[in-house]
């Protein structure tokens, strides 16, 4: 009998539904969740883009790193978007996107660290868990068991069943970004844009600005000289050819801009 049986039963009986994406590890958690009766009440989709080419296809791009927080956040944001498309009857507040990337012990010695990342995207927040193993200390099965535990703990917390991940360990870093009300309105399509200025932007400079660098500033200054208009940096939170931005990514992007730069958030994925 699974040690997670009662927790998973409560997940299936909760009012939440979710899409779960796993790459490089975490498939044991999917198995644990699906083998408990009632999984169709909560699981909308479980997807395993295991090969690098499969993850490229899922993200519509080749990520800088296949096992990283940024990649996992993108996967979770896309999973949440998929949940909203699959289940149009459930309120977005009751839908979740969960993703995990992992680099675990295998049949050869890895150069990099053994680690995993879990991200949960919801209507109101993004939640991330970054964990680094002590390399060579545990077997693959032992590492996978820890990944499974954290996925189920994080998921049960997101479903309101318990407090979720409560571990106090230097191996783990937890970050939660709560969405501003305006971000939620933009995601829900209730407003068309959010601007750092009270003025309607006249000159738009679109880009991901991940990160913002001196070249962007030089282009902005040149555009202002040629047009006489003050440019606003546009960050599209949901491009046609990219996964949506998580709240982590939205916050990190807008915090780059000093008060001397205007910016605007939109959902205008196409011109």
Predicted regions: what is each one?
Residues 14, 37, 73-76, 235:
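Conserved active-site segments centered on acidic
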Residues 9-14, 53-60, 234-238:
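A short, surface-exposed helix-loop junction/capping segment
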Residues 3-5, 30-32, 53, 86-271:
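Nucleotidyltransferase catalytic core that binds NTPs
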Residues 19-68:
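Glycine-rich, small/polar surface segments that engage phosphate groups of diverse ligands
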Residues 57-85, 251-265:
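Short, structured active-site "lid" loops
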């Amino acid at each position: 009998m699974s040690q997670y049986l009662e927790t998973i039963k409560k997940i299936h009986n909760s009012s939440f539904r979710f899409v779960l994406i796993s790459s490089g590890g975490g498939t044991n958690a999917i198995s644990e969740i699906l083998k408990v009766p009632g999984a169709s009440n909560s699981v909308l989709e479980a997807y395993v883009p295991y090969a690098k080419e499969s993850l490229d296809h899922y993200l519509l791009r080749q990520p800088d790193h296949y096992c990283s927080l940024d990649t996992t956040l993108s996967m979770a944001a896309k999973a949440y978007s998929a949940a909203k498309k699959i289940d149009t009857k459930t309120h977005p507040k009751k839908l979740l996107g969960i993703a995990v990337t992992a680099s675990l012990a295998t049949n050869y010695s890895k150069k990099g660290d053994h680690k995993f990342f879990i991200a949960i995207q919801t209507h109101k927040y993004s939640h991330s868990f970054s964990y680094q193993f002590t390399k060579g200390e545990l077997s693959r099965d032992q590492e996978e068991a820890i990944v499974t535990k954290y996925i189920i703990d994080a998921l049960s917390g997101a479903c309101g069943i318990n407090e979720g991940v409560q571990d106090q360990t230097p191996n783990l870093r937890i970050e939660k970004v709560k969405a501003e009300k305006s971000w939620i309105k933009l995601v829900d399509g209730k407003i068309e844009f959010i601007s750092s200025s009270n003025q309607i932007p006249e000159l738009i400079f679109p880009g991901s600005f991940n990160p913002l660098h001196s070249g962007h500033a030089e282009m902005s200054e040149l555009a202002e000289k040629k047009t006489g208009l003050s440019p606003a940096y546009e960050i599209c939170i949901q491009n046609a050819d990219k996964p949506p931005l998580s709240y982590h990514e939205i916050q990190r992007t807008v915090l780059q801009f000093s008060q001397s730069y205007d910016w605007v958030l939109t959902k205008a994925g196409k011109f």
